[in-house]
């Protein structure tokens, strides 16, 4: 049982102003595995004050000093690898192999990318007699989601530290353990007091007062659209800068010259990875009518090989859904798909056989899906694929862009000219060609209702900066 009922404020583990706690549930066992403080406004006020007090000092540190700090973090993060992997498997239910290969590694990659971005990043630019300066924005509030406890948290922290902005972090109350380990890492390597503050709690008690605090100059949030909208509304009262990474309903366009087995394997992975709890999941798979039958036969074969089960057992590829609430939501969407006339091709409602305990869902494929159906328009956040057929490339692109979201898109095939045309035509912040993968120095963010701003690498650093022009500086 993990007991993390203290907050990390101004370089110290301190008692929360609140006596209440939040239980953390292992979604694979449905058992309580720990608790964290249920913080309140007083905790937030204390944390923001600590960050504000150190702001000017941290802002004026040199690039080399901040690089050295990030380098220390990288080394200690690597030392805590096993602790991070175990925590994520416990709190999220991710298979151990996924916790190590994806969750742990992505968190590390962002600290490395921010450190390395500072090698060539120009914080000052001369323009004739004038000077343009980029300065740390100030106290930044970070609110992170449960589906990627290290990735989403590390990318924000790394960028803020690189920019010279102190932070107050509110991680998800459903997966808070990884953030506590990060706090321990920062404490060990000597992150200056007040630069990093951790306040555990829920949205009402911590998220709202953080978003509304007059000394917070920037809010960076990853999560659902409705919550992002509320944060924007609260931040607007004093015109805070806001960076949002929100939902998606990403298209995966399969071209007619594709290797069908490769395409089926790739599209399967994009839907079942992290139990489908991925904002960039390619859940709308667009397939040419002329290869539909062959593709579906191979797709069923690929899905049949996916092993759902205990995240601590070797060979498990897909763990549980994060909570009963989320499990019920996934079930509701599956039932909605059936009600609206989509054809259930694989999986369906309920739990996989032998997995009655835990929030396990059946990987599911719907075919003959109309893009206007609920399952094709709304983010499900579970291992559910909608297969949509198209006649020609123009129709595929039209269907791909017929969504309120624009976070990611995918295309797979052989003809380079066609691949490039599709990639440029998809209205999304990130497009992958032939499973190329996203490097941590590339910008990440969404079009339309998928968010505002960009994260990762130097683009992420810029979210935590203000731009100042000084006329006549060199006269």
UniProtKB/Swiss-Prot annotation:
Keywords: NAD, Oxidoreductase. It is an enzyme of class 1 (oxidoreductase). The active site is at residues 245, 279. NAD(+) binds at residues 146-147, 223-224, 246, 379. It catalyses: an aldehyde + NAD(+) + H2O = a carboxylate + NADH + 2 H(+). InterPro entries: Ald_DH/histidinol_DH, Ald_DH_C, Ald_DH_CS_CYS, Ald_DH_CS_GLU, Ald_DH_N, Aldehyde_DH_dom, Aldehyde_DH_NAD(P). Its EC number is 1.2.1.3. GO terms for molecular function: aldehyde dehydrogenase (NAD+) activity. It holds the Pfam family Aldedh. One of its GO terms (biological process) is aldehyde metabolic process. Belongs to the aldehyde dehydrogenase family. This is Putative aldehyde dehydrogenase.
């Amino acid at each position: 049982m993990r007991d993390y009922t203290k907050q990390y404020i101004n370089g110290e583990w301190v008692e929360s102003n609140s006596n209440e706690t939040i239980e953390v549930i292992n979604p694979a066992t449905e058992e309580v595995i720990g608790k964290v403080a249920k913080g309140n406004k007083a905790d937030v006020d204390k944390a923001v004050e600590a960050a504000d007090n150190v702001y000017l000092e941290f802002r004026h540190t040199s690039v080399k000093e901040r690089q050295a700090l990030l380098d220390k973090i990288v080394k200690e993060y690597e030392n805590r690898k096993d602790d991070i992997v175990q925590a994520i498997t416990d709190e999220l239910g991710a298979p151990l192999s996924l916790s190590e290969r994806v969750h742990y590694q992505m968190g590390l990659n962002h600290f490395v990318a921010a450190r390395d971005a500072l090698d060539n990043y120009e914080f000052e630019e001369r323009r004739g007699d004038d000077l343009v300066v980029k300065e740390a924005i100030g106290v930044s509030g970070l609110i992170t989601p449960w589906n990627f406890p290290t990735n989403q948290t590390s990318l924000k922290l790394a960028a803020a530290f690189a920019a010279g902005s102190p932070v107050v972090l509110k991680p998800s109350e459903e997966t808070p353990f990884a953030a506590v380990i990060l706090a321990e890492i920062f404490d060990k390597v000597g992150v200056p007091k007040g630069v990093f503050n951790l306040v555990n709690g829920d949205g009402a008690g911590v998220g709202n007062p953080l978003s509304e605090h007059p000394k917070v100059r920037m809010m960076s949030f990853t999560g659902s659209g409705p919550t992002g909208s509320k944060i924007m509304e609260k931040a607007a009262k004093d015109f805070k800068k806001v960076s949002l990474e929100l939902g998606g309903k990403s298209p995966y366009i399969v071209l007619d010259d594709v290797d069908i087995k490769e395409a089926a394997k790739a599209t399967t992975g994009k839907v079942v990875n992290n139990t489908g709890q991925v904002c960039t999941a390619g859940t709308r798979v667009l397939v040419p009518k002329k290869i539909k039958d062959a593709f579906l036969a191979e797709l069923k074969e690929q899905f049949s090989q996916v092993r759902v089960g205990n995240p601590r057992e070797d060979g498990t590829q897909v763990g549980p859904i994060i909570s009963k609430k989320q499990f019920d939501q996934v079930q509701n969407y599956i039932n909605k798909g059936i009600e609206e006339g989509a054809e259930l091709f694989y999986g369906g409602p309920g739990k996989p056989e032998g997995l009655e305990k835990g929030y396990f869902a059946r990987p599911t494929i719907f075919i003959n899906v109309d893009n206007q159906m609920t399952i094709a328009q709304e983010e499900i956040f579970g291992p559910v694929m909608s297969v949509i057929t198209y006649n020609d490339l123009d129709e595929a692109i039209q269907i791909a862009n017929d969504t309120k979201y624009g976070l990611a898109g995918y295309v797979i095939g052989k003809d380079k000219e066609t691949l490039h045309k599709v990639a440029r035509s998809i209205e999304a912040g990130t497009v992958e060609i032939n499973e190329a993968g996203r490097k941590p120095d590339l910008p990440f963010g969404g079009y339309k209702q998928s968010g505002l701003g960009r994260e990762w690498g130097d683009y992420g650093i810029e979210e935590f900066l203000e731009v100042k022009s000084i006329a006549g500086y060199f006269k």
